[in-house]
């Protein structure tokens, strides 16, 4: 029997509905994307200036069947080919998560397939493995709307939290400042675009915290920006939105970059990866690439389409769990406050 006959490919169907994207994907061996379908709801939430949970859930219900069918069709696979179904079980919006979890449970039952629950942030981390194989020990900087964390990994599926935000996540701060500047939703990309046209003319605070801490804090920065805008209005002064964006972004990016660099050095890692929606930010990407250039370990940032929520990353993370023998029962429930462990 040849080696190819001995080792069968592992094909996983991934499902992601934790926030405002309904997504399904088929991934082979945790590395090869066979299909990656995403139905975004940005237009539906734009007029509200943020994600409305009830609307998000309704859209997921409308889209989930179509998205799943499209993912299977585009991958050109049958249900016989699929080894397991991986689904985001948390964290996220509970109503949104339930749509994906229930769809996954129904399919697992009907098609007699193993079910694997996946942590959303583990998914963001494993989006990187769709581009580059992991080399341990490895450091992951996770920056998204709800999370800002530094995670040390010594092997697949092993997550040691060495730093996290003590208040607002970086993405939350971006969204709140964007609303103050009356920018359309989603605010993060809008600030990134404005910042590219502005100058860092305003000295906003950097929260370094304790000397040995890898934690983050963005609430003070957010308040400083809001106060600056309010004070300017009261004095009838006109502040450049571009300069506010550039100054705000410089503060966020410097802290993220320096703490990541310091942690990478202290823990003597072989690889640094960046994950999450804010990893699409061009200011952050440039800062990290500049800081890590010339180092003897690589920095990897996934392409834009793998930074934002998608199901390929859930299938990639689910592959590792599946191969380690992890299985979820059919009473799996959505867990909006699931801890990465």
From Swiss-Prot:
Its cofactor is Fe(2+). Binds 1 Fe(2+) ion per subunit. The keyword Metal-binding applies. Its EC number is 2.3.1.234. It is found in: Cytoplasm. InterPro entries: ATPase_NBD (IPR043129), Gcp-like_dom (IPR000905), KAE1/TsaD (IPR017861), TsaD (IPR022450). Fe cation binds at residues 120, 124, 309. Signal peptide: none annotated. It is an enzyme of class 2 (transferase). Keywords: Acyltransferase, Cytoplasm, Iron, Metal-binding, Transferase, tRNA processing. GO terms for biological process: tRNA threonylcarbamoyladenosine modification. One of its GO terms (molecular function) is iron ion binding. Substrate binds at residues 142-146, 175, 188, 192, 281. Belongs to the KAE1 / TsaD family. Required for the formation of a threonylcarbamoyl group on adenosine at position 37 (t(6)A37) in tRNAs that read codons beginning with adenine. Is involved in the transfer of the threonylcarbamoyl moiety of threonylcarbamoyl-AMP (TC-AMP) to the N6 group of A37, together with TsaE and TsaB. TsaD likely plays a direct catalytic role in this reaction. HAMAP family: TsaD. PANTHER family: TRNA N6-ADENOSINE THREONYLCARBAMOYLTRANSFERASE (PTHR11735), TRNA N6-ADENOSINE THREONYLCARBAMOYLTRANSFERASE, MITOCHONDRIAL (PTHR11735:SF6). This is tRNA N6-adenosine threonylcarbamoyltransferase. The gene is tsaD.
